A protein has these predicted regions:
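Sec-dependent signal peptide recognition
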Residues: 2-9
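Hydrophobic h-region of N-terminal signal peptides that target proteins for export
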Residues: 9-19
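Extracytoplasmic cell-surface/polysaccharide-interacting catalytic and binding patches
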Residues: 19-98, 106-118
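Segments that shape or occlude catalytic/ligand-binding pockets
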Residues: 101
């Protein structure tokens, strides 16, 4: 019983510290990089940071606005943006989705569970 309570307390503290830090800090700690930090010409409009997505609600509660990706993916997008800019000056890539926490993935799954979208 004591071990179970201790485990529960540790998990709760871990969860609370994760909530307080914010997604962007957690993504950075896990090695993801901000797409716009790598290439400022890439535009970002995250679908799940707005309510005009398939769930109808904002899923990023802490106001995340930047796209966080694996460094290799971010570098590849930056290379593509540079190529696009050389071929079509003034045109920009638009990132609509990127790394997302499992909590958001669960909310998405629950939003479509039992519907034809599932």
């Amino acid at each position: 019983m004591k071990i179970s309570l201790l485990t529960t307390a540790v998990l709760m503290i871990s969860w609370l510290s994760t909530q307080a830090r914010g997604l962007e800090e957690i993504f950075a700690e896990r090695g993801y990089v901000s797409v716009t930090a790598i290439e400022p010409d890439i535009m970002v409009s995250l679908m799940y940071a707005r309510d005009d997505n398939f769930t109808g609600v904002v899923l990023y509660d802490d106001g995340i606005k930047d796209a966080w990706l694996h460094p290799d993916a971010a570098k590849a997008l930056a290379k593509a943006q540079r190529e696009l800019s050389s071929l079509m000056p003034g045109c920009h890539l638009l990132v609509k989705d990127a790394a997302r926490p499992m909590s958001v993935q669960r909310r998405m799954f629950n939003a479509v569970k039992g519907t034809p979208k599932a």
